[in-house]
Each structure stands twice: as structure tokens, then as C-alpha cells.
């Protein structure tokens, strides 16, 4: 059982790291004066989905970490 949990922990860790790395940085400030604005709802929808996936795998990572630490 512990091997299955460790495998799921590794998978959730890898997906969490990749989902964090593919996030677009929220550039706010003086550097964005001449940059393009995002008016497309498709971009916002993708960003919202990516945020949900990131939070889901963060929760799974913390859950598996806690369970494995108790064992």
C-alpha cells in the first residue's frame, strides 16, 4: 500500500511542478504600459482551468505527504 501511495505522491509532485511552471506570470506595473491586453475569454478560461488543476494537485500532494509521514 505504501508503494502505491509513494507512486501517486511522485506523480502528483511532477504534475504540480509542471502546472506551476506553465503558469503565465501576472505582469502588473510600469512594464505593461505598452504591452498587449488579453481580451479573449479563451485565455481566461485556460488560466482558470490551470489554476484549478494546480490547486487540486497541491491538495493531493499535501494529502499524500501527510499520509506518508504518518506511516
UniProtKB/Swiss-Prot annotation:
The chain crosses the membrane at residues 4-24, 50-70. It is found in: Plastid, Chloroplast thylakoid membrane. One of its GO terms (cellular component) is chloroplast thylakoid membrane. It is a multi-pass membrane protein. One of its GO terms (molecular function) is protein-transporting ATPase activity. Belongs to the SecG family. Involved in protein export. Participates in an early event of protein translocation across the chloroplast thylakoid membrane (Potential). This is Probable protein-export membrane protein secG. It comes from Porphyra purpurea (Red seaweed).
